[in-house]
Amino acid sequence: MIPSPVPWPYPIEFDQVERLDTDVLVLGGGAAGCMAASGACDAGARVIVLEKAATIASGASGSGSDHWESAATNPCSKVIPEELVDAMIRAHDGFNNGISHYIECREGWDRLLDIEAARGKIRDTDDQFVGAEFRDEKTKLLFAYDYENRFNIRVWGQTFKHAQLRGAKRRGAKFIERTMATGLLTEGGRFGGRVVGAVGINGRTGKCVVIRAKATVLCTSRPTRIWLFTIGAPGISEFRPPQCTGDAHAMSWRIGAEFTMLEKAIKAEWSGTRSFPPYGAGNNHNSWYACTMVDAEGREIPWLDRDGRELATVSERYRPAPGQKFFLKGGGEPDFPVYELTGPETLPVDELLKRGYKLPLYADLSRMPEMERRVIWGVMIGNEGKMKIPIMQAYTQAGFDPAKHMLQSYGDGWKSGAFLPQERQFFGLPGGLMNDWHLRTNLEGLYAAGDALFASNCYGHACATGHYAGRHAARYAKQVGDVALHEPQVEEQRARLYRPLGNEKEVTWQELNFAITRVMQHHCGAFKTDQLLVRGIAALDELERQEASRLVARNPHDLIRIQEVLNILTTATIVVHSCLARKASSKTLHFSRLDYPGIDPPEWRQFVAVRPTEGGVASRQIPLDYYGDLPDNYQRENRDYLEARRKR
């Protein structure tokens, strides 16, 4: 171990091992993890949560959220869960997780009430927006996007993680913070065996933690930093927090877990040094919907409904078109327009230029009605993740007044940056772990929730699937006896953890992360062929055999960062294998094979799942509707939960 340039402020405990025992182990204490802990506790299980940061602000949503999507059972919704999840599936041409999104639509409102019960703010209790058309006067709920159908709720998400942590602790969950899970343990140490616990490391002391568990729930978000990483500014390399590094993906792959849709990656948006801060430049989407836009000469940009009808008022931007039941915005909407589900939008940039509009464009809140202006620059920007301090506070202190000033758009039209085709990221509904109706993976004893699942998205989805996976894991834990750890496997994991301490100054974690992104951009970018992908696997394998073995750590912090980059390397390998397995191009998946140019041929309109074997990698095709009848299967698997709700 090379010396640190400054004294390490915590005691070093590399030689110590803490052993714990529980019924349900939750890995990751973000939105999904906190709810998984609550769900498992509600089902009577002992619960330990392993979180590598401080839970009160950890995870992809730790810095806030501005809306709760798809709350189809809230008292004001005019859309039922079956309608909404059917639309979400059709919006993505079937490439969606029907199980997890049905859970989201069916149970999301329940979870929002759980957060409110723990003092999270979900209503306009201060009566700041009395009389606004997006407010329901009886419930004091505020709605976003579709004001007619009211299934997306504006929330004060800055209060949510505090509330979730309180709620889980009140139920009896034990949180072990600043400790990263680094490896899963299996019965008898067997590849593909039942999962019986995990190993982790404390990022301050370096102490190893070994936890034996009857069931384990993975809640560590989606991977980042696979195609995008800036050595000089690692904290803004990706849209999501940089510590979201695919830990669940990598740990579970190493023991035989199955994944799908990881071939889907879109051209990057809102990330790194090519981009202005997300939602900090002029735009009209998501948190800023439906802000008025103007061109360089002050001409207002027209808003159109799905039929091309120009909308005369701001109010119409939040309403379905004549004859349209509802539209999708704010989570789950399609990447490519679907007529039945398309909501109001501004005229496309290429058409604007043809009509003589001048770049750059600007977001002009001063032209919005006062209530709309305050709810965007206040509730939305004030509560969305990464917005409160770097945008709301910083811009206000710099003198920005939304009633007077405009914000410029950058990149392509209203977007905040411009990227090269090979610069990709997991955005929208990416791939992840395959799941059944218990949110169990293909490995016994291993469950997943939130962004660890395939086709996942948003805060409400994370919370709903977290609680669901937690209670099903608890049910399983009650049915099994004690589990035993395989000590040679534990020692192997410990040796792997501390190996970088013995290296001289060679390769840093930043250098390895940057090298991974170069390989992925060159061999798994916008266009793919078998030859490129095979060479990509070889290049990643070379990085693992050579550079990864020379990684050097100065302290426990470095050990954590090294484990993250090793997880990125493993996840990158899964991605390339997923791309190799799909022998067809796909519009919906943003997937282009030069050697298989046919777009979505019928025989490939299926999920392609990959998993490691002891001799290589296996793949199989799974029907897009493998989940069967959604309401029937849900009710069959959740009778106890539904009965408990009826008794309330």
Q: For the regions a protein language model found, what residue spans apply to each?
A:
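Core beta-strand elements of the Rossmann-like FAD/NAD(P) dinucleotide-binding domain
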Residues: 19-22, 205-215, 442
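Glycine-rich FAD pyrophosphate-binding loop
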Residues: 42-62
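Conserved beta-strand-loop-beta-strand element in the redox core of flavoprotein oxidoreductases
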Residues: 186-209, 216
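N-terminal Rossmann-like FAD-binding beta1-loop-alpha1 element of flavoenzymes
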Residues: 24-49
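Glycine-rich loop(s) and the adjacent beta-strand/alpha-helix scaffold that form part
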Residues: 218-279, 459-473
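Extreme N-terminal leader/targeting segments of oxidoreductases
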Residues: 1-24
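Long, amphipathic alpha-helical stalk/connector segments used for oligomerization, subunit docking
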Residues: 478-557
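Mobile, glycine/GP-rich and aromatic-enriched active-site lid/loop segments adjacent to catalytic centers
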Residues: 109, 117-183, 188-194, 261-454, ...
